[in-house]
Every structure is written in C-alpha cells, then in structure tokens.
Amino acid sequence: MRFIPLYLLLIVCITLTANSKAESGKQMAAAFEEKYPFFTMKDTAFTFDSEFNLPDGYRYMDSTELTSYQYWISGFPLWHRYKPVGIWKGGKRFEADEVSRVVNLPWKGQNFDDVGFPIYILAEYLRHLHRESELAIIPRLGDTLDYPTWLHSKFVLTGLGAVKLIRVEQRDTSVYEYYKLLDIMMRHSIYKSLTANVDSIPIENIAPGDLLIGHDKQGRKGSVYFVMNMIINKSGEKLYCVATGCPEACDFHIPLMNLNRDNPWIDANRLQELISDYPFYGAFRWRIP
C-alpha cells in the first residue's frame, strides 16, 4: 500500500480550507451587494459581527423587533480596522486608531459632509426598494426637492440663494438623474433644515436610522450623529453605536467612544451628551412611509 506523505496532506487541507474561505467570502460579498446597492467589495464583507465585541449579556436586535429600515441600517457594511478616515481633498482626517471603524459607504465630493450623509443613506435605502419616487427633502431655502418633480424641472437659485425648480420637458428616470438630485439636496441642506425633514422623538425611543442633531441659532454650525445599531440585554437596557461625518467632507465613520476600538457602544445618556452643548438639539426620525 502506498501512503501519501503527511506534508502533502497538509498542503491539500490548507488549500481546500483557503478555497472554502474564499468562496464563503464571495458569497457574503454578493449578499451584501444585493442588499446595499453601493457595496463594491467582491471577496469579503466586514460587519458589526466581525468587527465588534458585544458586552456580556447583550445581543443584536432581530428583524421582528425593528422596522425594515431600522433592520437595513443595523446590517450596514463596515471597513476593516486598518482603514483611516479620508477627506474629500485627499489625505486623512483621522488615522485608523483614532476612530472605531469607517463605515463602508462610497462617496466623492465636498457635499458628503455630516449633514449630507444622512440624506445620502435615505436615498440609498429608497433606491434599494425601488422607491426612488418617495425621495423628498426640504432644503435650507426654497422649493421642496422631490424626485418626481425633479424629472420635469431645472434647478436655479434666486438672488437670495433659495432653491427654485422651473418646469421643463419631462426626462426619463435614471441613476444619473437620481444622484444629480441627491447632490443638490445635500448641497443645499444645513443642520437646521435637516430637522425640517424629520420628526422629534424621545431619546429613549431612538433606534437604528435615527438622528441626533444639535445646532446654533442660525443652524449653520452643529453636529449630526446617525444611529447605526442597537443592542439589548434581558433587562431591556439598550446600548447604541453612532456614526458621523465631518463639517468638511470626510469618510462616514464610527467615532472612538471608548478606550477599546472594538467597543463602540454607549447608553442614551451619552447619546444626549454628544449634542447637548448646542442651544438647539434633539433626537429625530425620518418620515418613511
């Protein structure tokens, strides 16, 4: 009887394991691409499960405990731990170890600031559901911007800088038209105008997809935090993970909230502390049908 050398068996086992992991990574990436239209990785996906630790006794919320939008948000893809926070002009805003993680959300241009990202995420959710016609945003000044009206309008600014839509010949719906409108929405939004598009909610009711917004009297200076995920224990106590952008466009990222980068979880009191230094602040929820 001929025996296969042990080292050959080891090589075969290692190769089979590597191939299996590669195939599993491709399947995971394909599943994320179907759920998140912006996802571009082809061989793997980084998630809350793979990147973060859960405190003892806590678990993630399941689909029966959240709305479809909240559950979609809670499954968002992340970047690996070595990704720094880039800025739109090139270079870095933060080194990788200065934040918890970067959210895997492709972007390009100066309108992707901390006010713009929540609008961008809402637009991606509606696109995922093929409900683009429901995208509508009240800007800083002027006409409400909605996708159906946009398809038979052109965009101009008044002398006071207000958005005005002038009726023109109907255009066909397209990815180009959708993102062109999104760019205008983000460009003409500020902290205060963002609150005109959402409903105020008690901080204790906050859930994935909700916003924490604080701003000054004029509404031009402030902060926006986006609730990415929520965990709960048997006593009903909840912890949250938030993400944000920068006043000058940068990667959407999860700030370093604790000494351990793998522990992004904070309670409702700390959520409020993020924005309570501003004279106007609160927790808010999108009006999603």
Regions flagged by a language model, labelled:
Residues 1-26:
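Bacterial Sec-dependent N-terminal signal peptides
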